[in-house]
């Protein structure tokens, strides 16, 4: 999706005030359901971390974090988090969680280099979750079973919203479809990765694409991933077909996390082996951190999807350029 897309004849199904009420109801329901389904405990999350810790999410490796210094500790370069992908794994260790237990956070982040459009904002709000598994559970079966459990939360949330607001129609299929990024490329060799996502989601409605970060047979990647949290062979994206846009929309990115071997392999491929010296990476390589599975689920994306909104700014307060604000107002898109 480029810049701003205006759905033809768009009219919001809820007023501004109804939207605010629905956002709270939806978030509360989803959060409770997710915690029960995955056995997660809510914990407090940092808004910023010390750059030298290696805990911030480097995303695709080119995005600049918001950084600042502070009077009390001028020697530190402090960064607003991009996500808590690595912090959560360390927290599971520090809080002495056991196998089968996990945590989740109500995470807020700023991604200053995000390209703004209907589904992208510099303000990111998501449920970041992480759960301890055994090394023997680092396999596709564990990944798929966890995805199915999360999809069950999405289905229950849609039922909840439709029951409260009957003029919102159900669109999610009964089951989630799995496909690897290589199978997807083989299926649609002439399409871009984003076009492939829409093609497969139009066919099946809800899809989990497995294996993101490494190169495909074509020599291209399906998408970029940081080399030091997801195992690129055991991760993926959860996408739904969104009729309002006639496109696939990503609701969650998740995966089984790197072990010692896959971390070293991926750091070498990504040409950033110097990260091995950072405290987080040292702990991982020394076997001090638990093996985990985890991910992030976009709160505003979920609200936008289930409330059938045309712009993420209808469900969160952020910054938008004047042209986008004006065009939205002219087309019944009321930004918060």
From Swiss-Prot:
Listed GO CC annotations: cytosol
Top-level taxon of the source organism: Bacteria
Gene: asnA
Keywords: Amino-acid biosynthesis, Asparagine biosynthesis, ATP-binding, Cytoplasm, Ligase, Nucleotide-binding
Chief location category: cytoplasm
GO molecular function: aspartate-ammonia ligase activity; ATP binding; catalytic activity, acting on a protein; transferase activity
ATP-binding recorded as keyword: yes
InterPro entries: aa-tRNA-synth_II (IPR006195), aa-tRNA-synth_II/BPL/LPL (IPR045864), AsnA (IPR004618)
One of the GO BP terms on file: L-asparagine biosynthetic process
E.C. number: 6.3.1.1
Protein known as: Aspartate--ammonia ligase
Presence of keyword Amino-acid biosynthesis: yes
Subcellular compartments: Cytoplasm
Family the UniProt entry places it in: Belongs to the class-II aminoacyl-tRNA synthetase family. AsnA subfamily.
Reactions listed under catalytic activity: L-aspartate + NH4(+) + ATP = L-asparagine + AMP + diphosphate + H(+)
Organism this protein belongs to: Clostridium perfringens (strain 13 / Type A)
């Amino acid at each position: 999706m480029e810049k701003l897309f205006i759905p033809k004849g768009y009219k919001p199904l809820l007023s501004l005030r109804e939207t605010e009420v629905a956002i709270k109801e939806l978030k509360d329901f989803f959060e409770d359901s997710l915690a029960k389904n995955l056995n997660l405990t809510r914990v407090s999350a940092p808004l910023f971390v010390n750059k030298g810790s290696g805990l911030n999410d480097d995303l695709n490796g080119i995005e600049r974090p918001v950084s600042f210094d502070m009077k009390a500790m001028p020697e530190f370069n402090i960064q607003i988090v991009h996500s808590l992908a690595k912090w959560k794994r360390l927290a599971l260790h520090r809080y002495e969680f056991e196998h089968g237990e996990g945590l989740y956070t109500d995470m807020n982040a700023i991604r200053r280099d995000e390209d703004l459009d209907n589904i992208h904002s510099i303000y990111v709000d998501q449920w970041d979750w992480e759960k301890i598994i055994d090394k023997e559970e680092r396999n596709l079966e564990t990944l798929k079973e966890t995805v199915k459990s999360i999809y069950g939360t999405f289905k229950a949330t849609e039922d909840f919203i439709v029951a409260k607001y009957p003029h919102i129609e159900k669109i999610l299929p009964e089951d989630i479809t799995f496909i690897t990024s290589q199978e997807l490329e083989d299926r649609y060799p002439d399409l871009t990765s984003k076009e492939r996502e829409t093609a497969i989601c139009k066919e099946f409605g809800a899809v989990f694409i497995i294996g993101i970060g490494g190169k495909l047979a074509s020599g291209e990647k399906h998408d970029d991933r940081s080399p030091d949290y997801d195992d690129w062979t055991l991760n993926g994206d959860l996408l739904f077909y969104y009729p309002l846009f006639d496109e696939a929309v990503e609701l969650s990115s998740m995966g089984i996390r790197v072990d010692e071997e896959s971390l070293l392999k991926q750091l070498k491929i990504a040409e950033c082996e110097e990260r091995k010296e950072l405290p987080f990476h040292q702990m991982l390589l020394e076997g001090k951190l638990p093996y985990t599975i985890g991910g992030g689920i976009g709160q505003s994306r979920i609200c936008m999807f289930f409330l059938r909104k045309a712009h993420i700014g209808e469900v969160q307060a952020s910054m938008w350029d004047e042209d986008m604000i004006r065009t939205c107002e002219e087309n019944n898109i009321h930004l918060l």
